[in-house]
Amino acid sequence: MAAKGISTIGAASRSLSSSLMAAAKEPDVENLRLIEELTSNVDAVQERVLAEILGRNADAEYLDKCGLDASDTDRATFRAKVPVASYDDLKPYVKRIANGDRSPILSTHPIIEFFTSSGTSAGERKLMPIVTDEMARREVLSSLATSVLNVYVPGLHTGKGLYFLFARSETKTPGGLTAQPALTSVYKSEHFKRAYAYTSPMAAILCEDASQSMYAQMLCGLCQRHDVLRVGAVFAAALVRAIRFLQLNWAQLAADIETGELNPRVTDPSDRECSRGDWTGIVTRLWPKTKCLNVVVTGVMAQYIPTLQYYSGGLPIVSGMYASSECFFGLNLRPLCGPSEVSYTIMPNTAYFEFLPVGEAVDASNLVELARVEDGREYEVVVTTYAGLNRYRVGDVLCVTGFHNAAPQFRFVRRQSVLLSIEADKTDEAELQRAVERASSALLRPRGASIVEYTSRACTERVPGHFSPALPHWTLAP
């Protein structure tokens, strides 16, 4: 179905999608049709999602305190009665659940585990409640991203992926619920095992010793080098770290493969290529059938783009999905775009989305619905989820870059709370990234050097502080 009044941008997107669907194969065709249906009816889908969330959580304590009952499933009542919330606002409720209170506090559906967010609150990791059907919801959206990539990069299903994936340790809350990173939960899921098409054995991925896990995954990837069609990790930093691990350990890896008496056609090229000392395009030299890299290169991960381009010999870098501990957000419908041009199309069936314009007061009346954001403006994303997060400030700042049908497309800008400061100044991660790029261009490139990665901290040892708002620490490569 197509929505009325779709812009010329939407019309162009429909035309592009039609050509993609003509080239697609089942079941990718059905997934592409679902994307078109969802993005053409954003407002109606969002209204349905909110009604579902409010209806199923009507008996939850949190919504009851807001003054909602089972009949209050419309947007107007929701906007009038439910306040914007931070993690500190929800923390007392989350703590009760973590301590074993099984009453319907945030959701009437049982909380089965917590995803630990990378953000912190008062030095503690944030705990995001997860209900039974959340993983299935994420699996559907992941399959949509796979279908989009299959059309742009055909034939990926005929080989394997060398993905450096690392599980983290889980903990138990006082009430006995598991608390772990979202990705660790994914790696342990039955869906992940069913859809498995990677060179790394599950035991290596789930190994909590990062060094042993890296060694085993690299070893298996080298042994299956002619089966690899894509190379990646979740974040760009992890893939760069894997290649640097190979630089330091290639001789031992080659020796282990040789000792294992594998086919010389597998072992010899790895040894020869790594011993040359030239690591330009090492990915395609070791894994010659690789079609793309698959990593997140948005936000602070953008610093690794030049390094990945160097190691891969210019392979396409795909950032396919945008998700967090709170929920799944959207897909990159142009996965082969330049890494600096990545935008994500929000999928309206995953949660109820609202947006706070950057610079405006944190007030419920200032929130803008998904279908009503403006092109070119920056917003902080606010979500209402099936698990009981209501009008929750995620902390991500996004910029609207266009539309696919009626669905807004967003570029990730920065985390709202990530700042460096000496006095009254405030330098966010996007500003720091631009400063480092300018310095690298002016000072390093003329000398044939480049930045592999960097970090920074506020420099307050001297008074007054440095004119620069941060003291950066750079790792350089010749």
Curated annotation (Swiss-Prot):
Pfam families: GH3, GH3_M. Its EC number is 6.3.2.-. Keywords: Ligase. GO terms for cellular component: cytoplasm. The keyword Ligase applies. GO terms for molecular function: acid-amino acid ligase activity. One of its GO terms (biological process) is response to light stimulus. May catalyze the synthesis of indole-3-acetic acid (IAA)-amino acid conjugates, providing a mechanism for the plant to cope with the presence of excess auxin. Belongs to the IAA-amido conjugating enzyme family. This is Putative indole-3-acetic acid-amido synthetase GH3.10.
